[in-house]
């Protein structure tokens, strides 16, 4: 439109009236609300408005139609058309979010200054606000889903992986420690039992040996005393030999009778020694205490007691028959 008017303006002053007439004639026919190539926000395309616009243009500079057309064009461009305002305001809403360039910020500023209360601007702002509000909602909706997913994954990790590993390690450690501890305690207990048993056996063996020695000592003393008495008997028996000589046959019978009780006493002594050895046998179970060593001291007092028991009847028999007393002792 501006180019067409500039071409007509070059023909002469008569062209000055044509733009107004053309505007008046063309304005009623434009039902879509377009004028000078721009969209009107209010949709007012009445001929009165067109005439007023044409008169203002003619009054501004009637002698220079070309300048008149250029100035309205400049004014229209500077006033920022409604379409530019519509486009600028959504850009303004998007600018703070995306950090728009200064050029975009200037354009929306002009658009807002030109038509701040236009419905389209309000609609654009509402749309931008809705988009801005919806975008956080979308972000919120997107963020909860990963947040919900991540805790599930974490729960799975905690419940299955970490706890299972920890429980596995703990069970393994417990089993190993329990096994090692049990094994260590078992040998310790066994060693303690062995030591206790060995100590008890050794103590019993020592006690038995001591008792055997004590019993053997008096037995030996008694035997020594009996031997001394037996040694002194022959001296006393010498004067009696003459009186006893004719009685040799009955004396021999008496010696036999004396030997029989001595044998019985020997058997009793052997049985007593066997019983003592049997009593001390359990104590010999401990290590380092062989039964032979304990049985030997037990047999010694038994032998001493047997010898003393045998010596007594021999002494009794010696006064009766002194010549046969030494062979009786030798036989014993």
Curated annotation (Swiss-Prot):
Post-translational modification: Phosphorylation by PKC displaces MARCKS from the membrane. It also inhibits the F-actin cross-linking activity. PKC-mediated phosphorylation increases 4 to 5-fold upon TNF-alpha or LPS induction. Myristoylated. A proper myristoylation is essential for the proper distribution to the plasma membrane.
GO biological process: actin crosslink formation; actin filament bundle assembly; actin filament organization; apoptotic process; central nervous system development; mitochondrion organization; neural tube development; neurogenesis
InterPro entries: MARCKS (IPR002101)
Principal place of residence: membrane
Expression tissues: Detected in spermatozoa.
Keyword list, A-Z: Acetylation, Actin-binding, Calmodulin-binding, Cell membrane, Cytoplasm, Cytoskeleton, Lipoprotein, Membrane, Myristate, Phosphoprotein
Biased composition (Polar residues): 26-35
Bias kind Basic and acidic residues: ranges: 250-271
Span list, region Calmodulin-binding (PSD): 152-176
Subcellular location: Cell membrane; Cytoplasm, Cytoskeleton; Cytoplasm
Segments of this protein annotated with the region Disordered: 1-332
GO MF annotation list: actin filament binding; calmodulin binding; identical protein binding; protein kinase C binding
Residue positions, PTM N6-acetyllysine: 172
PTM sites of type Phosphothreonine: 143, 150
Gene Ontology CC terms: actin cytoskeleton; actin filament bundle; cell cortex; cell junction; centrosome; cilium; cytoplasm; cytosol
Pfam families given in the database record: MARCKS
Organism phylogeny: Eukaryota, Metazoa, Chordata, Craniata, Vertebrata
Expression induction: By TNF-alpha and LPS in monocytes.
Name of the protein this chain belongs to: Myristoylated alanine-rich C-kinase substrate
Assembly and interaction partners: Interacts with CDC42. Interacts with GTP-bound form of RAB10. Interacts with calmodulin/CALM1.
């Amino acid at each position: 439109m501006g180019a067409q008017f500039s071409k007509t303006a070059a023909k002469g002053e008569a062209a000055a009236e044509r733009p107004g007439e053309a505007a008046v004639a063309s304005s009623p026919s434009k039902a879509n609300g377009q004028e000078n190539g721009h969209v009107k926000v209010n949709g007012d395309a009445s001929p009165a408005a067109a005439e007023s616009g044409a008169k203002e243009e003619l009054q501004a500079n009637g002698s220079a139609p070309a300048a008149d057309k250029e100035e309205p064009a400049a004014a229209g461009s500077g006033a920022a058309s409604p379409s530019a305002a519509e486009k600028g305001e959504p850009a303004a809403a998007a600018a703070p979010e995306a950090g728009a360039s200064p050029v975009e910020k200037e354009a929306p500023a002009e658009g807002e200054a030109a038509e701040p209360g236009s419905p389209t601007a309000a609609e654009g702002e509402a749309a931008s606000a809705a988009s801005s509000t919806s975008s956080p909602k979308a972000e919120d909706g997107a963020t909860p889903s990963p947040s919900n997913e991540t805790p599930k994954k974490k729960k799975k990790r905690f419940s299955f992986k970490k706890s299972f590993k920890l429980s596995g390690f703990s069970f393994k450690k417990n089993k190993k420690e329990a096994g090692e501890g049990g094994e260590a305690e078992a040998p310790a207990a066994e060693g303690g039992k062995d030591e206790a048993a060995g100590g008890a056996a050794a103590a019993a063996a020592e006690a038995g040996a001591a008792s055997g020695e004590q019993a053997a000592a008096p037995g030996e003393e008694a035997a020594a005393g009996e031997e001394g008495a037996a040694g002194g008997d022959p001296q006393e028996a010498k004067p009696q030999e003459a009186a006893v000589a004719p009685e040799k046959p009955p004396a021999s019978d008496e010696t036999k009778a004396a030997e029989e009780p001595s044998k019985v006493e020997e058997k009793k002594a052997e049985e007593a020694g066997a019983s003592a050895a049997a009593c001390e046998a359990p104590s010999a179970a401990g290590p380092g205490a062989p039964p032979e060593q304990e049985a030997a001291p037990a047999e010694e007092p038994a032998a001493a007691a047997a010898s003393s028991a045998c010596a007594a009847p021999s002494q009794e028999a010696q006064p009766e028959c002194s010549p046969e007393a030494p062979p009786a002792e030798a036989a014993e």
